[in-house]
């Protein structure tokens, strides 16, 4: 499959967000701690923890910091107080939004998420209001320059659902949620270590945004991601390259 990267715009926006390194690390440490608490502190035996460690290393977190977070999860009851929640709603112009949070205070998190939607011209919806528009999938991304044919062969042999070659030469490998870990590890064993590997929510349909709407939607997404309890924000926004260039 070929085409322009529908998800590239989100990656560009995430690069801006990643500048807030301290906040990103806080979220990663929380995921490491909870993953270790729930599935044990040995990454080889805990797929969720293994993925969390990979993401932390990709973000340039030191191994010492990672090990301390894992040790905290195994040896502390703090992670037991954490619950994982999701919220659904609409950004301006009806763009669908899903927010995933990890919190020890449901009321605080709900109030903060609701405030962000309200302040940015969106609406917090009920459970199921937009979830039907998304499918949870694994996504493994490779920068331009990778051997396209060899990667495609390896991905399909490993059980990938789809391989998308983007206009800029980057490649995204998509998997079912259940097969994500096995496909990612099979690709790594074949010499294809993704620049980014994550479980994400892929929309079945997208909303193409103009500059004004994109600014409003990204303002909401940025505000949501600034919340300490929020781990991930997904949308069905598709921002064309020319609009993204104007956003800077």
Curated annotation (Swiss-Prot):
<dbReference type="InterPro" id="IPR017856">
    <property type="entry name" value="Integrase-like_N"/>
</dbReference>
<dbReference type="InterPro" id="IPR029072">
    <property type="entry name" value="YebC-like"/>
</dbReference>
<keyword id="KW-0804">Transcription</keyword>
<comment type="similarity">
    <text>Belongs to the TACO1 family.</text>
</comment>
<dbReference type="GO" id="GO:0005829">
    <property type="term" value="C:cytosol"/>
</dbReference>
<dbReference type="GO" id="GO:0071281">
    <property type="term" value="P:cellular response to iron ion"/>
</dbReference>
<keyword id="KW-0805">Transcription regulation</keyword>
<comment type="function">
    <text>Involved in regulation of the quinolone signal (PQS) system and of pyocyanine production. Negatively regulates the quorum-sensing response regulator pqsR of the PQS system by binding to its promoter region.</text>
</comment>
<dbReference type="InterPro" id="IPR026564">
    <property type="entry name" value="Transcrip_reg_TACO1-like_dom3"/>
</dbReference>
<keyword id="KW-0238">DNA-binding</keyword>
<dbReference type="GO" id="GO:0003677">
    <property type="term" value="F:DNA binding"/>
</dbReference>
<dbReference type="InterPro" id="IPR049083">
    <property type="entry name" value="TACO1_YebC_N"/>
</dbReference>
<dbReference type="InterPro" id="IPR002876">
    <property type="entry name" value="Transcrip_reg_TACO1-like"/>
</dbReference>
<dbReference type="InterPro" id="IPR048300">
    <property type="entry name" value="TACO1_YebC-like_2nd/3rd_dom"/>
</dbReference>
<dbReference type="GO" id="GO:0006355">
    <property type="term" value="P:regulation of DNA-templated transcription"/>
</dbReference>
<dbReference type="Pfam" id="PF20772">
    <property type="entry name" value="TACO1_YebC_N"/>
</dbReference>
<dbReference type="Pfam" id="PF01709">
    <property type="entry name" value="Transcrip_reg"/>
</dbReference>
<keyword id="KW-0963">Cytoplasm</keyword>
<protein>
    <recommendedName>
        <fullName>Transcriptional regulatory protein PmpR</fullName>
    </recommendedName>
</protein>
